[in-house]
Amino acid sequence: MSKRKSPHDFLFREELGHGSYSTVYRVVERSSQHQYAIKICSKRHIIGENKVKYVTIEKNTLNLLGQANHPGIIKLYYTFHDQENLYFVMDLAPGGELLQLLRRQRVFSEAWARHYMCQLVDTVEYIHSMGVIHRDLKPENVLLDKEGRLMIADFGAAYTVGQSDAGSDGDKPATSFVGTAEYVSPELLLENKSYYSSDVWALGCMLYQFLQGTPPFRGQNEMETFEQIVNLDYTWRIPANPLAAGLVSKILVLDPSQRYTLEQIKKHKWFSGVDWNNKEKIWRGSWTIASESTPRPRVGYKSRELLDTPIKNIPVVTQRNKKPTKMNTTSSIVEWRKMLGLSGNDLGIKATLGGNGLPIAPFTPTSGITPDNRGDNAVAPAKTRDAFRPMSSRVISSPHSKPSGRPAALPLPLQTGTPSHNVVQQIVVNTPGRTETSSPYVSPTVPVRNAIWKQDWVQLHEIPYSAKYSGLTLAGFSQVSDTLIADLISHHANELRTLSRTGILSLDNTGYLSFIEQGRARPLSRIIDPDLSIYEYQLGHSTEDDFLILEKYKQSIWIVWPNKPTSASRRIPIKETWAQTLSKYKKQVSDEEELSAKLNRTCVSSWGSRTPSPTYPAEGKTRVAVQPQDIPLPSPAKSSSNSGVSEPISKIPPRQLVSASEQSHKAKSEAHTKKANSYSYIAPNDMVLSSSRYEVLRTASNNDSKSNGAAVSGASAAFRTLRVNK
């Protein structure tokens, strides 16, 4: 008998992905040098998030299904635990997720779609023969081995027939809400029940997705998606083989008793050339049937550093929820059923399950639902069911709905080459007793190689400002602080990832930060906006765990974190974090503006007839003529005896826009004017101007100031790094 495994028996390589309650790594067993995938579940997380049930179900189901070594089931080799984590050692899937392959290909050729459907049908047939309903079939839960063969994974939502949630009453179907919105069966929505036929429904959705590139039912939010499902509201955007479309129409049927069974699917004309008894041919690798239209994708791992560190140092509790959290769909289904007034068996449908996984009592269609009796070649049109139309006028729209996938391609940079200077028109400056026209002002330009400073895939969640909220919440905020930000992210990281949207964050050469989602760019703010503050929060030990927080004063907070791109080349630049890029940009703009200010500064001589040239603020601001007597001279800073660093002189508020005419009313008496004109005012060397409302002026200690007068950069809240050591 082999000894019990432990984390120290494996070398941890790169991270492969995240689930709703786990993190997966590629590992190498030290003794055999065999590669596996290891799923690590934080005990604290699964207990705190009530995931113990899902972890237990997955382990028991994999042990049950692993008895026959079916090629379509991911195999569980070892399970063990330590004080902090649970560990599942499983088959490695070098080909990644089927969803990733589909996104790269956009659509599958008919040959590939048929081949994958054969393997799915054969695997689901085996799963059902073992008395198991998967209940969350989707391309994201289907993995590929190195030869391109499918392996169904993620059995955390599975239900074993004969084992109710209470451990008895084996003749009842599953009655808990699980699954993903776009693949949820209508009987789960309308009856609160899942059958074997519910998995068949998901297969129909997947076949449609193979040929069209997207699921058949996808609304602006989950509520709208549910309405499309119960109305069979889907269309074919791309021409498809009528036989394949006809098969989909036989599977996507509202009545589960009228829906095609797996046996009927196998006998359909679209599979006429398939020998279902020839398992070797069915389970050959998909790369062997690659055609010119669907080239073989590259399989392999990006080279990463070996993680040969103690397991306790691996940040497994950092969840980014690449897969949607099931509880999110659950709450949406509950809300949707409440809106329709559905609960229990309101539709009068018996819940008794027969041996074939279908209800014993035939399903009686509700008003507006008719069985689909069309032929094989017919395509199901969109139906209208007035019985369930309350949703049409009460669809709940969520501005934070998470998109199902990334845009098809990364937008190209807006322009290339070094941008030219921006020349501002001449402006008229009104001064007491005289009017002058200033010379054209050339705004400082940040020297960049391309128009795009940085762009990368991110997840983004926006929190609007509202005085009705106390502090900082996911729904709104009225105040912000380091502590509030740290508490929100550390305690609500999973909710943030569920509510977030996937897109591209882009910073152009003009300093505008934009969020690009589904081909549409939305400007967020200019980096040098005085009302913008920037924070950085690191939840784990990797730069991939960094959260970027952008706060627009009394407007919005944007919480941003990386979403790993499929190719590192899509990052601009590749190695810089967002915090590093923004900090570099602000510093460069500040240096340029300081140099420009020195060049444009005009000293006022004793000639009283001459007016000073106006001082210009940053590009994009209203330019104001400022009299020298209006410029306050800083008082000497008092040095702290303890720290040796001077206290801030003052806190700079947001700049106010003041017209030249209003400024002229502030003119002092003639005596003060003459006195002001008798000397040249130059800003002291130790004054630090800020572009953030949180930045403050600091001066050097008395000793340093006397010795060299060097400027000391102020302590800025614009970039704070909050590191949580777990």
From Swiss-Prot:
Entry annotated with the keyword rRNA processing: no
Active-site residues, Swiss-Prot/TrEMBL: D136
Enzyme kind, highest EC tier: transferase
Catalytic activity: L-seryl-[protein] + ATP = O-phospho-L-seryl-[protein] + ADP + H(+); L-threonyl-[protein] + ATP = O-phospho-L-threonyl-[protein] + ADP + H(+)
GO biological process terms held by the UniProt record: cell integrity MAPK cascade; intracellular signal transduction
EC number(s) reported in the record: 2.7.11.1
Biased composition (Basic and acidic residues): 663-673
Matches recorded under InterPro entries: Kinase-like_dom_sf, PDPK1, Prot_kinase_dom, Protein_kinase_ATP_BS, Ser/Thr_kinase_AS, Ser_Thr_kinase_AGC
Binding site for ATP: L16, G17, H18, G19, S20, Y21, S22, T23, V24, K39
Signal peptide: none
Residues covered by region (Disordered): 629-679
Domain Protein kinase: 10-271
Pfam families documented for this protein: PH_PKH3_C, Pkinase
Keyword Kinase: yes
A molecular function (GO) term: protein serine/threonine kinase activity
Top-level taxon in the UniProt lineage: Eukaryota
PROSITE patterns recorded: PROTEIN_KINASE_ATP (PS00107), PROTEIN_KINASE_DOM (PS50011), PROTEIN_KINASE_ST (PS00108)
Keyword line: ATP-binding, Kinase, Nucleotide-binding, Serine/threonine-protein kinase, Transferase
Record function comment: Serine/threonine-protein kinase.
Similarity comment text for this entry: Belongs to the protein kinase superfamily. Ser/Thr protein kinase family.
Protein's name in the database: Serine/threonine-protein kinase PKH3
